[in-house]
């Protein structure tokens, strides 16, 4: 599974923000390493931000690695219902291009427990979590991180992170290439 921050948690308010390219490059680099180790499936829940950018990275990598697949496992039906139209359209594209789509609770939003159940289900049914997360900027990813760490106490599970330092290194690499 890949997850992390939502755009507003990173101060990103449009699709042209330069930080998105840095995040996508970091995801691509890590996914390439995982593909070399046998990665076949990427799982996301369709959230805006890191998860939607992950889907875009997978689309690019599929050209080179046609065996790579991705699934969207949402916490509830119609999660995009209250989103603005451009975000809904992007979400619909992510759903349409996915190799597998399902919803954990099979009903529209009722309460926050649906997010918790989605996180539990995905952690229990995947081999690892790739998380864009920085301890100094907690935000929403802290909950799934805690859940993964607890699961790791009794299961063979990988928690891989991309933190602020990793993103800074990517930004510097990109800057050097542009010189």
From Swiss-Prot:
The protein's superkingdom reads Bacteria
Q: Name one Pfam family in it.
A: YpsA
Transmembrane spans: none
Q: What NCBIfam families does the entry give?
A: PRK13660.1 (NF010181)
What family is reported?
Belongs to the UPF0398 family.
> Which HAMAP family does the record cross-reference, listed alphabetically?
UPF0398
Q: What is this protein called?
A: UPF0398 protein Bsph_0756
């Amino acid at each position: 599974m890949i997850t992390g921050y939502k755009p507003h948690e990173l101060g990103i308010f449009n699709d042209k923000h330069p930080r998105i390219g840095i995040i996508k490059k970091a995801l691509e680099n890590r996914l390439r390493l995982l593909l070399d180790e046998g990665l076949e499936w990427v799982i996301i829940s369709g959230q805006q931000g890191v998860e939607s950018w992950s889907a875009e990275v997978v689309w690019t990598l599929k050209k080179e690695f046609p065996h790579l697949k991705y699934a969207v496992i949402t916490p509830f039906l119609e999660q995009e219902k209250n989103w603005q139209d451009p975000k809904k359209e992007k979400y619909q594209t992510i759903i349409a291009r996915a190799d597998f789509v399902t919803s954990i609770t099979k009903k529209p939003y009722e309460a926050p427990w649906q997010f918790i159940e989605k996180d539990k289900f995905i952690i229990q049914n995947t081999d690892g979590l790739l998380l864009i997360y920085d301890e100094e900027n907690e935000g929403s990813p802290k909950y799934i991180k805690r859940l993964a760490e607890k699961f790791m106490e009794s299961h063979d599970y990988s928690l891989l992170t991309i933190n602020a330092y990793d993103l800074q290194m990517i930004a510097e690499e990109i800057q050097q290439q542009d010189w």
